[in-house]
């Protein structure tokens, strides 16, 4: 259904248009996209005639600031925070609306000799400010189009236009598939672009390390920072190992209530203690402590979820009622940390099959699943049963 990101990058590099589709949980829309430096009047006319949506120009903020093109509003209340700026026309145009004159404005916006006085405001080109970090920060067409131009080695700007149906409604995936087929355009998804970038780019940096004596023995605490959200993650490392040696690993998501306060609503604290004890007994291994509180929803939202559970929802229902998926965690950052530590094969301490799939999806090999099942208690039996029945956790005692 979707072309590979490699194929799409090649088309962008060659000056061809593609269709980029976002997630069905977001807008579920498709935009025709072309690199700005490849966008001539023919491409603009195609968008106006066949795509029929609003023709916009994603571009990096640095260039917008150089040209003194400011945001359209000071307080953005758009549902998806689409970062429109004041519209512009190149001063060398007349009305600015024709395909030829819009193409001229696009070219002027990326021309290094252009200066702020070369543009009239308002105009007929709608610049969109790119959020640095791209689709890894915001999964929108603005970021997706710029990421593709950068991956193609072109100037970080694009021209995009939403695809509308003949009846004026927005084209969804079935119609977008037909549109792409009819016009011989490759179709790509932002989800695939996110996955591509996560696989190809290093998204964590090692900050420092220090000795950490614990009640379970001596570890080395290695601190990492994610380049996606600036969160810090900690790996507790014990011993040394050969490159191909399967290492005992626990990827543990932060749980303040369980790990620190000893909450009996979950089994997280006991799992943390058990994992550290097992690694210490083994003499080598890694405990990776990820800042993914509440399966990724954060501490305050987790307490809100607890309140909903007090009122009868289970842990999955509570997340959904708050507007979150059952599990927001992504294992790409954790996988990159493990690779940086020299882990290639692991004996993974987990009850969660999704965690195994998530880590293996980034090239790590899980040679064995080591169960880390704690005795359930009256306060957490329902929670654990929900994880087994609705999330597929492997819990033999329930």
Curated annotation (Swiss-Prot):
InterPro entries: DHBP_synth_RibB-like_a/b_dom (IPR017945), DHBP_synthase_RibB (IPR000422), GTP_cyclohydro_II (IPR032677), RibA (IPR000926), RibA-like_sf (IPR036144), Riboflavin_synth_RibBA (IPR016299). Its EC number is 4.1.99.12, 3.5.4.25. It catalyses: D-ribulose 5-phosphate = (2S)-2-hydroxy-3-oxobutyl phosphate + formate + H(+); GTP + 4 H2O = 2,5-diamino-6-hydroxy-4-(5-phosphoribosylamino)-pyrimidine + formate + 2 phosphate + 3 H(+). Keywords: GTP-binding, Hydrolase, Lyase, Magnesium, Manganese, Metal-binding, Multifunctional enzyme, Nucleotide-binding, Riboflavin biosynthesis, Zinc. D-ribulose 5-phosphate binds at residues 26-27, 31, 138-142, 162. The keyword Nucleotide-binding applies. GTP binds at residues 250-254, 271, 293-295, 315, 350, 355. Binds 2 divalent metal cations per subunit. Magnesium or manganese. Binds 1 zinc ion per subunit. One of its GO terms (cellular component) is cytosol. Mg(2+) 1 binds at residue 27. Zn(2+) binds at residues 255, 266, 268. Pathway: Cofactor biosynthesis; riboflavin biosynthesis; 2-hydroxy-3-oxobutyl phosphate from D-ribulose 5-phosphate: step 1/1; Cofactor biosynthesis; riboflavin biosynthesis; 5-amino-6-(D-ribitylamino)uracil from GTP: step 1/4. The keyword Magnesium applies. Its cofactor is Mg(2+); Mn(2+); Zn(2+). One of its GO terms (molecular function) is 3,4-dihydroxy-2-butanone-4-phosphate synthase activity. The active site is at residues 327, 329. GO terms for biological process: riboflavin biosynthetic process. Mg(2+) 2 binds at residues 27, 141. The record marks 124, 162 as: Essential for DHBP synthase activity. Residues 1-199 are annotated as: DHBP synthase. Residues 200-398 are annotated as: GTP cyclohydrolase II. Signal peptide: none annotated. In the N-terminal section; belongs to the DHBP synthase family. In the C-terminal section; belongs to the GTP cyclohydrolase II family. Catalyzes the conversion of D-ribulose 5-phosphate to formate and 3,4-dihydroxy-2-butanone 4-phosphate. This is Riboflavin biosynthesis protein RibBA. It comes from Syntrophomonas wolfei subsp. wolfei (strain DSM 2245B / Goettingen). The gene is ribBA.
